[in-house]
């Protein structure tokens, strides 16, 4: 599944201390999943990676003993928490799928996952834990930024510049196409791209 593939990529990122795009190219892009599932897995990996600090804070606040959870379990919880908090996934579905995902790496941790993810769903009601209009820490959490980085951005760019930077950092990158005029005309490339979409 897309979630299991994303979880595998997150595990490799943690173990190898590699770049997300390199792991995505080696695992997700070469998988036999549908194009939509590969895109979803990629979105999950990039989303969890970019919001990891915020997700870890939320998960830690929802666990009685955060240090006791194995790294693979924390990866699965982070993936599910990302879906709940940042993708606004249906809470019931996110908890059920998150429990199943955790069980793929720790079969006996289903109860823990259920309890933690239900708490994440409840915590989401108060997320980002403050008023983002007046509280920079809440604004940072809302955009998945570590608070220390938000504070540094304010020092460098001012409050408005820091807010603009955080918003822009979460926008999807634009797609550009370069046409090799020796191999195809611009019209041919446009036609091929239109047909592929």
Whereabouts are the PLM-identified features?
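Class I Rossmann-like S-adenosyl-L-methionine
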Residues: 1-197
């Amino acid at each position: 599944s897309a979630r299991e593939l994303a979880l595998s990529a997150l595990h490799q990122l943690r173990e190898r201390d590699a770049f997300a795009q390199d792991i995505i190219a080696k695992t997700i892009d070469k998988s036999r999943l549908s194009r939509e599932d590969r895109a979803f897995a990629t979105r999950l990996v990039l989303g969890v990676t970019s919001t990891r600090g915020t997700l870890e804070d939320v998960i830690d606040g929802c666990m009685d003993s955060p240090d006791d959870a194995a790294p693979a379990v924390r990866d699965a919880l982070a993936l599910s928490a990302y879906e709940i908090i940042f993708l606004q996934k249906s809470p019931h579905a996110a908890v059920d799928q998150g429990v199943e995902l955790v069980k793929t790496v720790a079969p006996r941790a289903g109860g823990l996952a259920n309890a933690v993810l239900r708490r994440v769903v409840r915590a989401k009601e108060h997320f980002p834990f403050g008023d983002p209009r007046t509280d920079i820490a809440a604004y940072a959490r809302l955009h998945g930024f570590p608070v220390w980085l938000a504070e540094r951005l304010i020092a460098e760019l001012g409050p408005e510049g820091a807010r603009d930077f955080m918003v822009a950092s979460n926008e999807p990158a634009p797609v550009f196409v370069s046409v090799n005029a020796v191999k195809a005309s611009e019209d041919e490339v446009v036609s091929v791209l239109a047909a592929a979409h």
